[in-house]
Amino acid sequence: MNPVQDKPTLFVVHCIDTEGPLSESLEATFERLENSLDIRLKPGRETLRRIQSGELNLGDKTEGARAVCAPHNLEYNDSWPKVDSMLDEMLSLEYRQRFPDSEGHGCIFNWFAMDHVGFDENPRLRDVGYLNIFDHYREKMQETGANGDELHFHLHPASTYRQGHISATSYLRSPHLLEGLARRIVDRTWFPSCFRAGFYTERPDSHWFLEQWFPFDFSNNATSESATESMQQDIGGGRFGDWRRAPDDWSHYHPSHDDYQIPGNCRRTIFRALTVGTRMRLLKQSDVDAAFARASAGKPTALGFSDHDFRDMRKDVEAVYSMVRRSAEKFPNVRWVHSGARDAARRVLDLSLIHI
């Protein structure tokens, strides 16, 4: 028996919003800047460089603009060959073993795959169609023998005007949600157990829908809002991804019927997952320390973090596991393990595995 198995355990869950390739033109970047911060500038490479460096004085919005236009955020995998080039390395045993957990096991990835359907305009050149992304990753996992990885479900509701680059929140007005799930059952003999909300956004209609179908929800990204985040109109004040009232101590919870953000008597369990490699609600060293401290106190804990496959995730993986290693040194009594989302939920909740 490995002696570390007698220690308190922290389950580290890498959640990937799996959306396939994404392209964004220079003009679209400046349009997004205007929508987020109400900054209207003539698109240009030199202007973008000055925003990124902070040379362009935009008053109290300077840092917000730098966050929206950060170089890493704009380095998109804009084709399947680029995505696959990244995956070929990340899914290899050699790469996984660069980040061993307390038991020496390599990292595990959780692919929350979505369908790009329900829109007529596709300026970001998404791979449109049911099961396209699901099938691509399922085949890739089989090719590489990624037996520890898990495949799950991710959804972005359709915009009212059927524009693929516009974020929306209404599940009631997104019939492709039901068809996407039905196709997974009928065409692939598969149904998800874990879910992540697009743009981290839930509201009453999605809350009650999820309650009927998904036992495990990894959408909570509650954290204190920074000044840079609060000035961004699309995310500030809970506009998208409102988890301001939700637990931010890495505790999991059954939500209330009337408010998905507070503990109650609903059946599904919501877990926390903070973001990396983006412009909001970022995982910090203090967050990782808090997860280790909770586990050290004997409380079953899952530390979730999330990013997107349309960016180079290797930088994110390196950054997160550097933080994990530092925390592990502070809490030597804690055994930390890479985990699938479903497996972590089962273990944290002490659920028995039932074969049907």
Stretches with model-predicted labels:
Residues 354-356:
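Conserved small/polar residues in nucleotide/adenosyl-binding loops
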Residues 109-201, 305, 340:
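Metal-dependent polysaccharide deacetylase catalytic core of the NodB/CE4 family, i.e.
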Residues 24-25, 120-125, 162-166, 203-212, ...:
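A short acidic (Asp/Glu
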Residues 2-141:
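Active-site beta->alpha N-cap acidic-glycine motif
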Residues 91-100, 137-144, 173-185, 287-294, ...:
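Structured alpha-helical segments in the cores of large, soluble enzyme domains
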Residues 284-319, 323:
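Long, repeat-rich segments with strong aromatic
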Residues 2-46, 55, 123, 186-190, ...:
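Active-site-adjacent pocket scaffolds in enzyme catalytic domains
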Residues 19-22, 116-121, 160, 278-283, ...:
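Short acidic, S/G/P-rich loop/turn micro-motifs used as interaction or catalytic elements
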